[in-house]
Amino acid sequence: DAKTYMRMLRVDFKSRLGKTLGIATDNYESVLLFEPPEVPKTGMIQYLKTADMSSIPLFFKPATVRLDSFEKYALKKRKAYLDDKTWYIYIFTTKKAYQRQGYGRKLMNLLLSFAKERGYRLCLETNLAANIKLYESFGFNLMDSSFYKGRLEHYVMLYGNR
């Protein structure tokens, strides 16, 4: 309904050099952030660099190099499913104490109805096989399944007709 759509907040993330939209439950028990098709997709390291977080402690440097390498891999995988009709779900999270109580489902259903009404698709990624069933329950289809460097799971899922 119109009142619910008005709760969709436009958030301008400097670190994304674009627009990210977000919705949250009243007390932020669950948060869902997503990007429209025209927003350039970057990896997490680029996100942090643009956010001017250059003072990452030295002991985190090896981890950020590994993360950057994985992000490049993930970006290549998801780009195959992104086009001018596909929104990208960047973050979907619910605080542990509020999981399995419908908070996340409420937000996801809102986004799904928005996409369906306007003829958009939605793309998301997960690194947990256990999440696949959850996303399938919303109507997402598993499009790509791979292992980064043979050990880190990576799944790309798509909602809507392609």
Regions found by a protein language model. Give the residues of each.
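Conserved acetyl-CoA-binding loop-helix of GNAT-fold acetyltransferases
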Residues: 94, 100-113
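Conserved beta-strand-loop-alpha-helix junction that forms the acyl-donor binding cleft
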Residues: 90-99, 123-133, 148-152, 159-161
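Conserved active-site alpha-helix within GNAT-family acetyltransferase domains
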Residues: 105, 117-118, 128-145, 149
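A short helix-loop-beta-strand connector motif used in the catalytic cores of GNAT acetyltransferases and
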Residues: 3-23, 30, 84, 88
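A structural microfeature
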Residues: 29-32, 144
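Conserved GNAT acetyl-CoA-binding A-motif
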Residues: 85-87, 115-127
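Conserved acyl-donor/pantetheine-binding loop and adjacent beta-alpha core of acyl/acetyltransferases
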Residues: 31-93
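Short, well-ordered beta-strand micro-motif
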Residues: 24, 33-35, 156-160
